[in-house]
Amino acid sequence: MSASVSKVVVVFSGGQDSTTCLIQALTQYDEVHGITFDYGQRHREEIDVAKSLAQRLNITSHKVMDVSLLNELAISALTRDAIPVSHELMENGLPNTFVPGRNILFLTLAGIYAYQLGAEAIITGVCETDFSGYPDCRHDFVRAMESALVQGMDKKLNIITPLMWLNKAQTWALADKYQQLDLVRHHTLTCYNGIVGDGCGDCPACHLRQRGLDDYLQNKSAVMASLTQAIETGKPQA
């Protein structure tokens, strides 16, 4: 992360991960601009949650962008109400909640928006350590997208991924480090069924979130120490 970065664009869904990234960014940068994408998602309540959180956290600006074309192109349990969310993997080894091209599109549009604003970096809450199995959450993908944006727009632009090498318990610890654990727990929306806070308790997103929270609450000191170590001496931050 460059010391010269002062203005950033956060890809902001209103969920646990992106909200934690937003909270951290507000302590590190002069201008924090959020961008939220409306793609006709199953859990589209997250858009209103993102609007509310952006106002509550007093970020520099918040833009909601209509990308409904993605809904037409990408068939997934998150873009089709008729497809139930499954706990089983598909034949290709991916969850049926995977939306093909979603992060390719989101990071491309965030890059264009960053160019327009004169921002030096994009922040996204993707994670390879403790994630849902999506290929577009991996470190190598993010680096490839960063390279494509830099070459395609002839502009220096970093994609920062603060959570890339953290597990879910450490992500909860990060929110707690900034004294925002309760806000993230009770006012974000991660649930695929659109239920704020602890969610439905049944979908894969809720299971992952709750397991991480339980791990953190049962081992606060150890997890916080591991978070500090991961930040200071862990794998290089993407």
Curated annotation (Swiss-Prot):
Pathway: Purine metabolism; 7-cyano-7-deazaguanine biosynthesis. Zn(2+) binds at residues 191, 200, 203, 206. Gene3D superfamilies: HUPs. It comes from the Bacteria. Binds 1 zinc ion per subunit. SUPFAM superfamilies: Adenine nucleotide alpha hydrolases-like. Its EC number is 6.3.4.20. GO terms for molecular function: ATP binding; ligase activity, forming carbon-nitrogen bonds; zinc ion binding. It is an enzyme of class 6 (ligase). InterPro entries: QueC, Rossmann-like_a/b/a_fold. ATP binds at residues 12-22. The keyword Zinc applies. The keyword Isomerase does not apply. It catalyses: 7-carboxy-7-deazaguanine + NH4(+) + ATP = 7-cyano-7-deazaguanine + ADP + phosphate + H2O + H(+). Pfam families: QueC. Its cofactor is Zn(2+). CDD domains: QueC-like. Keywords: ATP-binding, Ligase, Metal-binding, Nucleotide-binding, Queuosine biosynthesis, Zinc. One of its GO terms (biological process) is queuosine biosynthetic process. Belongs to the QueC family. HAMAP family: QueC (MF_01633). PANTHER family: 7-CYANO-7-DEAZAGUANINE SYNTHASE. Catalyzes the ATP-dependent conversion of 7-carboxy-7-deazaguanine (CDG) to 7-cyano-7-deazaguanine (preQ(0)). This is 7-cyano-7-deazaguanine synthase. The gene is queC.
